[in-house]
Amino acid sequence: MKAELCQFCLRSGILCSKCRAKLERGEVTRLDLEIARLLVSIEDKYPLLQDVYFHGAVEADNILAILVRRGDANKILSYGGKIIRFLEDKTGKSIRILEYNTNERKFLEDLFSPLSILTINKIWLPDGTVETRVILKGRKKSSLNVNAMREIAKRVRGITLRVEFAD
């Protein structure tokens, strides 16, 4: 697996001076380090992980969003979901795999998966801010934590979301 931190640091758990500096500057968080180490630990069991580029992780409420390079989400979702289950067991959180540097629609589809997005609109408010309205198909699902999804979208992409449901 490729990441912002070097392989030696991820495998050993001891940070070199370069990786320690990245952590101190805030380029990498403790959560990023923890998740990257978990992914590296199962790399031998799941060889597809060797080609995955891990960008970072964001946590909101009880949901953990893992950011990977465009096209790498399918590699983590493969193996019948065993990688996701492993991460959920180790972290105790619900896992979302999101692709970094994709268009806004793809990002939102991944974020709200398995629900379908009917429409996405931009709302320009009088104070000059912009909100993105997402209308999801179906009734409000109890399994979907809308506030956590808003928080993840804000931290990852800087998007302010307004989520609605329609039949």
Name each model feature, range by range:
Residues 1-167:
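RNA-contacting regions in translation and RNA-metabolism proteins
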